[in-house]
């Protein structure tokens, strides 16, 4: 072999160079180099441990650590020359280290494989991203709570089947969004427990013959513990799948919220005004103000769902241990993280800026016989069985549809034609305020309950 397999770090066994197209097809450096910080961090910890167990001298350790620090600066200053011929982030950095410090650089890989190295890098990278995502969740959730508290008594229609159902408060509706995101954040925190385990030391698949101290490396890297089985450590990507499942659920919730915002900002609803900075216009229609942020988040949900399916499909037929298939884990994971981060950031800025059109909301709740259930409950309290009261109110609604009158707009004599149990005090329960205030229990839409729920939610966020 004349070119030493293009100076590849694994070229000793080969007698000819890799085909140029195959080299480009199998290289991952164009996307996995975003993990350079984690790769360097892991290598510095590995070198520290190797020196402590006597595999490296202190001088060799120091040369490696300083050399890696200089390489990080080269990368961050845009001076590093990435090579597709060196395949990935790991071999690019190791080759540059050897260029800088000589044969000592070739000792760094003692006691490890790219298999456990890349598994460690991904976990370190995802752990860093989870911290950012956690802050973004908190920012959005706190914004929701602030808005819910402010709108605790703002009345709007509650919907089922997108038809007016019962009056609720806008604050109560916002807290429903909050509850979705609360569960998503809990899933993120739970996912972190399984992300934060260290594969390093598993080597290729069976461990290593060197006297390594995995617990020490684990401590240096801030992992909660080591992966207990070397085969499993290098081969499974369930932690990435779990993250994508959490991300897909979160995006699904953001998509549901987006759908409501798109509807509510339309001229037909006009419940909400979205500030101009979150909208765009039309190239042909001068009047248009398009809710692009929620529309785009709704659209991006599909790609995150797709990334989850990609990773599940990637893993489903792989025998133990590592296979080249796993190179395909990174791009779906990276994009799922990027998409979720962007969506949470956009919502974190947009939600607190929502401007409700309170009178429009209230008028919409007044239409559509939203207090029909309240009238049925009123009759039950008069001693009428619920199914009978349901039928009575149904007839009253039919009359109201014919006469174009809401229940609260009918006279007492009109209402009494459906039941002689109806008295003057019926109008107390037919008001929108009376309807929402009557649901005065935990989880109910009464303004006092909304404020209490906000207080509990704030306390819970402060304690997690």
Curated annotation (Swiss-Prot):
Top-level EC class: lyase
Compartment(s): Cytoplasm
Residues annotated as signal peptide: none
Entry EC no(s): 4.3.2.1
Catalytic activity: 2-(N(omega)-L-arginino)succinate = fumarate + L-arginine
Keywords from the UniProt entry: Amino-acid biosynthesis, Arginine biosynthesis, Cytoplasm, Lyase
GO molecular function per UniProt: argininosuccinate lyase activity
InterPro entries (alphabetical): Arg_succ_lyase_C, Argininosuccinate_lyase, Fumarase/histidase_N, Fumarate_lyase_CS, Fumarate_lyase_fam, Fumarate_lyase_N, L-Aspartase-like
Family under the similarity heading: Belongs to the lyase 1 family. Argininosuccinate lyase subfamily.
Major location (coarse): cytoplasm
PANTHER family per the UniProt record, alphabetical: ARGININOSUCCINATE LYASE (PTHR43814:SF1)
Gene for this chain: argH
Listed GO biological process terms: arginine biosynthetic process via ornithine; L-arginine biosynthetic process
Protein name per Swiss-Prot or TrEMBL: Argininosuccinate lyase
Known pathway: Amino-acid biosynthesis; L-arginine biosynthesis; L-arginine from L-ornithine and carbamoyl phosphate: step 3/3
Pfam families reported in the protein's UniProt record: ASL_C2 (PF14698), Lyase_1 (PF00206)
Protein's organism: Alcanivorax borkumensis (strain ATCC 700651 / DSM 11573 / NCIMB 13689 / SK2)
Entry's Gene Ontology cellular component terms: cytosol
């Amino acid at each position: 072999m004349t070119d030493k397999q293009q100076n590849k770090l694994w070229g000793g066994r080969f007698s000819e160079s890799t085909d140029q197209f195959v080299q480009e097809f199998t290289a991952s450096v164009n996307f996995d180099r975003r993990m350079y910080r984690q790769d360097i961090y892991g290598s510095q910890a590995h070198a520290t441990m190797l020196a402590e167990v006597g595999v490296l001298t202190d001088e060799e350790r120091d040369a490696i650590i300083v050399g890696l620090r200089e390489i990080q600066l080269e990368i961050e200053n845009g001076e590093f020359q990435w090579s597709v011929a060196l395949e990935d982030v790991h071999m690019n950095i190791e080759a540059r280290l050897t260029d800088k410090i000589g044969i000592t650089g070739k000792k760094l890989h003692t006691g490890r494989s790219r298999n456990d190295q890349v598994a460690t890098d991904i976990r370190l990278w995802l752990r860093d991203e989870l911290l950012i995502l956690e802050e973004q969740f908190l920012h959005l959730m706190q914004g929701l709570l602030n808005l819910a508290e402010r709108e605790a008594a703002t009345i709007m229609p509650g919907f089922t089947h997108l038809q007016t159902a019962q009056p609720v408060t806008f604050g109560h509706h916002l807290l429903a969004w909050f509850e979705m995101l609360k569960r998503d954040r809990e899933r993120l925190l739970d996912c972190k427990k399984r992300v934060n385990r260290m594969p390093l030391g598993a080597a290729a698949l069976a461990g290593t013959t060197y006297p390594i101290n995995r617990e020490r490396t684990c401590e240096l890297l801030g992992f909660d513990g080591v992966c207990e089985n070397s085969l499993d450590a290098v081969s499974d990507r369930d932690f990435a799948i779990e993250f994508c499942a959490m991300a897909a659920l979160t995006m699904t919730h953001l998509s549901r919220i987006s759908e409501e915002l798109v509807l509510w900002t339309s001229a037909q609803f006009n419940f909400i005004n979205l500030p101009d900075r979150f909208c765009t216009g039309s190239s042909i229609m001068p009047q248009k103000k398009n809710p692009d942020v929620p529309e785009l988040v709704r659209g991006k949900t599909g790609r995150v769902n797709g990334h989850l399916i990609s990773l599940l499909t990637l893993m489903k037929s792989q025998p133990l241990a590592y296979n080249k298939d796993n190179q395909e884990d990174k791009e779906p994971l990276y994009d799922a993280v990027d998409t979720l981060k962007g969506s949470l950031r956009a919502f974190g800025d947009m939600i607190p800026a929502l401007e409700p059109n309170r009178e429009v909301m209230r008028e919409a709740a007044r239409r559509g016989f939203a207090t029909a259930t309240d009238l049925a409950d009123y009759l039950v309290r008069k001693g009428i069985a619920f199914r009978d009261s349901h039928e009575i109110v149904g007839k009253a609604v039919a009359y109201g549809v014919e006469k174009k009158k809401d229940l609260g707009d009918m006279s007492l004599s009109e209402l009494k034609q459906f039941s002689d149990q109806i008295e003057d005090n019926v109008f107390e329960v037919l008001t929108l305020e009376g309807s929402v205030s009557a649901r005065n229990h935990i989880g109910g839409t009464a303004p006092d309950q909304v404020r209490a729920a906000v207080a509990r939610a704030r306390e819970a966020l402060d304690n997690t």
